[in-house]
Structures are given as C-alpha cells and as structure tokens.
C-alpha cells in the first residue's frame, strides 16, 4: 500500500487507506460484488480510489469474459432475426437465462492489498446437450464493466475526492 498520506479533495481532511466492506453492482446479465477493496477514506467518510489508474485496472479485470464466464459462448445466427445457438450441438438456446455462474477472483494490483471480486453471469442451458453458456462475450464484458461502475456509485467511491 502507499505510504504517502493524501488530503481529501472534498473537505481537505487527511485520508487513510481503509479496507471497504462489500458492495455490489448489476447490469444486464452480470452482477459484480467487491469485498475488502482498499480505498482512501477521510474522517467525513468521503471515499476515493488509491490512485487514478486503480479504477480502470479493476474495471478491465472484471470485464475479461474468459475469466468470469464459461467458454466458449453461444453462437449468434440468423439473417434477419438473430438467435443464439449452442456452441456445442447447434441447438437453439432459450431466450431467458436458466442458471447462473459465479466466479470468485482474487484482485491484486500495484500498491494495494489483495481483495476479492465475485462475478455472477446469467447462463443459458442447451436443451440438446446440457451445456451452459453465456450468449455473448461482448455482452458479458460490457455488462461487467458497467456493473462494477454501478457498484462504485452505490458505495459512493469517487476518483475526484
């Protein structure tokens, strides 16, 4: 962790590195839960990230579909009306999710104590072969990125304080 003390940009008081509790964000088929993330916190409970690049590193970390979702994803087919098909047997997948995948990840970034991130992703089970898969890696990545941003807002963590 960083040894230098910084003042709060909102109120001017000293900040200290504090381990936050759990916070959650959701977007589409993805939910992200962050547990024990370090942050700079002042006496008035204004929170900000340890350093400017911290937020982008965390968002990129959770937006990697190969880390957070079963692979390979479904295949999108159709000329006019696009539908998702199983990547294993080609059967059409149900439109509604049939299950959920939960992956626990250990986040370890420069100048920060390690913390836990849990990513939940909606799955679609193939009636033909039973394979569970996400519809799209692009959707998982985009939704995970937005979900963690919603979590930051819910926990009131800012880059500019």
PLM region descriptions:
Residues 25-37, 100-123:
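Short linker/helix segments within small regulatory modules
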Residues 84-100:
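Short flanking/linker segments adjacent to small metal-binding domains or redox-active Cys/His motifs
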Residues 21-22, 28-29, 52-82, 99, ...:
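Short, intrinsically disordered terminal segments enriched in charged and Pro/Gly residues
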Residues 113-116, 121-146, 150-151:
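C-terminal charged interaction modules
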Residues 14-18, 51-52, 94-96, 134-136:
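Short, non-ligating residues that shape and space the ligands of small metal-coordination modules
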Residues 8-11, 42-45, 86-89, 126-129:
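Short cysteine-rich clusters marking metal-coordination/redox-active sites
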Residues 1-33:
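Ordered, small/hydrophobic-rich secondary-structure cores
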Residues 1-4, 31-36, 71-83, 92, ...:
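Short, flexible, mixed-charge glycine/proline-rich loop motifs
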């Amino acid at each position: 962790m960083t040894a230098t003390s910084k003042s709060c940009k909102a109120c001017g008081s000293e900040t200290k590195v504090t381990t936050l509790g759990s916070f959650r964000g959701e977007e589409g088929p993805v939910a992200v839960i962050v547990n024990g993330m370090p942050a700079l916190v002042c006496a008035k409970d204004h929170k900000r990230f340890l350093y400017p690049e911290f937020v982008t590193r965390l968002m990129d970390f959770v937006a990697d579909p190969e880390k957070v979702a079963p692979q390979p994803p479904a295949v999108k087919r159709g000329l006019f009306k696009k539908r998702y098909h199983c990547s294993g047997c080609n059967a059409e997948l149900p439109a509604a999710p049939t299950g959920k995948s939960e992956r626990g990840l250990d986040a370890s970034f420069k100048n920060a104590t390690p913390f836990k991130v849990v990513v939940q992703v909606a799955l679609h089970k193939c009636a033909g072969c039973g394979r569970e898969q996400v519809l799209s890696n692009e959707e998982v990545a985009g939704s995970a990125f937005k979900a963690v941003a919603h979590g930051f807002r819910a926990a009131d963590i800012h880059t500019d304080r």
